[in-house]
Amino acid sequence: MDRRTFLKGTSLAAAGSLLPLSGALALGATNDDTVSTGKERVKSVEELMTRKTREVIDQGLRYLAHRQISEGNKRGAFGTAGYAAGVAVTALAGLAFLCNGSTPVSGPYQKNIKLCTEFILKNVRSSGYISENDTTRRFSNMYGHGYAMLYLSQVYGMSKQRELEKKLAKAIKMTCEIQNNLGGWRYQPVARDADLSITICQVMALRAAHSAGFQVSDEVRTKTIEYVDKCHKKDGSFQYTEKGGRISLALTAAGVVSYYSAGIYEGPKIEASLKWIYNHRPGKATRQQVSPMNYYYAHYYAVQAMWHAQLQHPEYWNTWYPLIRDELIDSKRSRDGTWPDSRVGPEFGTAMSCIILQIPFNYVPVFSP
C-alpha cells in the first residue's frame, strides 16, 4: 500500500489546499539509488552513508543487542529498572534493528526483534493499553503506548502473527476511543486534554497500523488534522498545545510529521514549517530551540521531516542528513560507542541515534517517503 494514500479522503477535505504527493524512494534503497527532482539531485545512500557511519551504527546495534535481557521476567527489555525496562525503549530499540534490514524472520538481529515483540505483547493490557505495570516511570504512558503500537505495526506487516494482530487491534481501538474532542491525546489513556508531543506518537502509530491493514476511522483522521492545525503558528513553528506553550524544533518537526502521518504532504503550512526546521538545522539551533532533554526526540522527528521533503526540497535533505550524522558521531557519542542520555539512559539515546542514522537505508515502511 502506498503510504501517501493514507487518510487521503477526508483528510484533504479538512486540510483545504494541502495535497498529497507520490513516494520518492523504494523500500530498501541500494547504494546506487539516486532520485532526480529537476532541481538539486537527491544524494544517494552511498554518498550519505560513509564507512564510519556504518561502523558506528553496527557498534550501536551490537550494544543494544548485548543490553537486551534474554531470560526472566524482563525478557526482551533492555534493563531491569528505569526507562530501559519499559515498552518505549524496547520499541525504539526494535525499530533500530528493523532499520538495519533485519526482520522477525531474517537478519542478524532477528532474535532481538522477536524478544522485543515478545516483551511488548506481554505488556498489552486487556483494554489495549500497552504499558508495563510499573506506572512510576514517565515513559509508562502514552509515549510508550504510541512507540509500542508503531513498532508492532511494522512487525505485523512483516510477519502477520495472529496473537500480534489481536493485541494490536485492541491497542488501535483504545487509541481511537481516547482521542479527545479537540482531536489530540495526552500523557495518560483518558480523553481529557491534549498536547502535540503525545499526539504525534499516536497518529504516526495509527498511520503505521492503517498501512499494515488495520482500520482507522475517517473521523479520527480528520480530528487529528484539526488539532494539529490549532498548534500551528504563522511563522511555521508549532506550539506545545492548542492554547500555546513552548515552541521548539521537537514540536515543529512533530507537527510536520503529524501532517505526513495524516496523509498531508504539501501546502503553505508545511512549506513554512519545513523552512523553519531547516533554518534551525544542526549548528544553527539554539539551546532553547533544541534542549538537551529533548535532543533525540527532536532529531527523530526532524530527520523524518527532512527525509519526506526530499521531492520538494532535495537541498533540505542533502544538507540536513550530513549535519546530523556528523553531530551524532563526532559530538554526541561516548567513547564506548553509545549515545548517552542523562534522563532516560544510553539505551534510549543509542536506539534513537541508530534510527536517525539509518533513515537513508529506507527499510522500514512507516519511515518511507
What would you call each of these model-derived segments?
Residues 5-27:
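N-terminal export signals
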Residues 33-59, 77-112, 125-173, 177-222, ...:
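An alpha-helical repeat/solenoid feature that recognizes helix-turn-helix modules
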Residues 68-77, 121-125:
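A non-catalytic alpha/beta surface segment that caps or lines the substrate-entry region
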Residues 110, 117-119:
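Active-site-surrounding "flap" and adjacent substrate/cofactor-binding loops of secreted or lumenal enzymes
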